[in-house]
Amino acid sequence: MTQPTSQAHIAACLIGWPAAHSRSPLIHHYWLRKLGIEGGYSIESVPPEGFAEFVLHLKTHGYSGANVTIPHKERALQLTVPDQRACAVGAANTLYYDGSVLRSTNTDVEGFISNLDASAPGWDRTPHAVVLGAGGSSRAVVFGLLERGIQRIALANRSIERARALADLFGERVVPIAWTDAPAALPGAGLLVNTTSLGMKGQPSLDLDLEPLPADATVADLVYVPLETELLSEARARGLRTADGLGMLLHQAVRGFELWFGARPEVTSELRALVEADLVAHA
């Protein structure tokens, strides 16, 4: 881990409505302890009508930066100076000060790509990918894949109009397809990504036969409750490499911590075990 340059007390927070069940405090306090940084990370439940006042006076509330979650991500983009990633994704989840300027970024992109790099090195050798879903998470995934150099992304969604709208946003390398056409897009695809809630606890399963995927393909699922979805279980049974949603959750937290506390932390097996235990305890 990169060591901090200062020991001054720094505080960050998670702003949401509601935000009480986030694992972010557990993750950031683990890193603060490991790096010996005098700092804190707390949760602030802020309703939509109070969000602008809270963010514009973040320092007055005692914070040097913040994570932003539902339902504030789009509004955060408007109240800050966003970077290219936040603009492309259409949402900001991390706020930080650059002098007196409050800037924002979207670390879901880095979290997704870093998790793939850690879980399946060399995954980006494929020119083709299939992405399931066209919601907010899909925008971060598609942007990250295009930024990494993937040449063609088949984007499947139950609403083909929504898939087309996202494809129009990102250009000709993103091809919208009907949900029922997803199986036909799997042959030759070196990466399959599920960005939908299908397979999540309490949701219907993702009914997709992985047999057409190449033997060296990678399967990623953004769902992390349960830790191993049926999609990932089937992929592993076929000998395919996988990247789970918990890994993305951990990796997306790295950049925010670095921006606020001045040290780049590491995603370790110890941290993962800690968060896994918390997920099981609150299942």
From Swiss-Prot:
Record organism: Rhodopseudomonas palustris (strain BisB5)
Catalytic residues of the enzyme: 73 (proton acceptor)
MF terms (GO), sorted A to Z: NADP binding; shikimate 3-dehydrogenase (NADP+) activity
E.C. designation(s): 1.1.1.25
Signal peptide coordinates: none
Residues given in the record as NADP(+) binding sites: 133-137, 222, 245
Self-association state and partner proteins as the record states: Homodimer.
Sequence positions that bind shikimate: 22-24, 69, 93, 108, 224
Keyword Amino-acid biosynthesis: yes
Name by which UniProt lists this protein: Shikimate dehydrogenase (NADP(+))
Function according to Swiss-Prot or TrEMBL: Involved in the biosynthesis of the chorismate, which leads to the biosynthesis of aromatic amino acids. Catalyzes the reversible NADPH linked reduction of 3-dehydroshikimate (DHSA) to yield shikimate (SA).
Known pathway: Metabolic intermediate biosynthesis; chorismate biosynthesis; chorismate from D-erythrose 4-phosphate and phosphoenolpyruvate: step 4/7
GO BP terms in the entry: amino acid biosynthetic process; aromatic amino acid family biosynthetic process; chorismate biosynthetic process; shikimate metabolic process
Family indicated by similarity: Belongs to the shikimate dehydrogenase family.
Superkingdom of the source species: Bacteria
Catalytic reaction list: shikimate + NADP(+) = 3-dehydroshikimate + NADPH + H(+)
Keyword presence, Magnesium: no
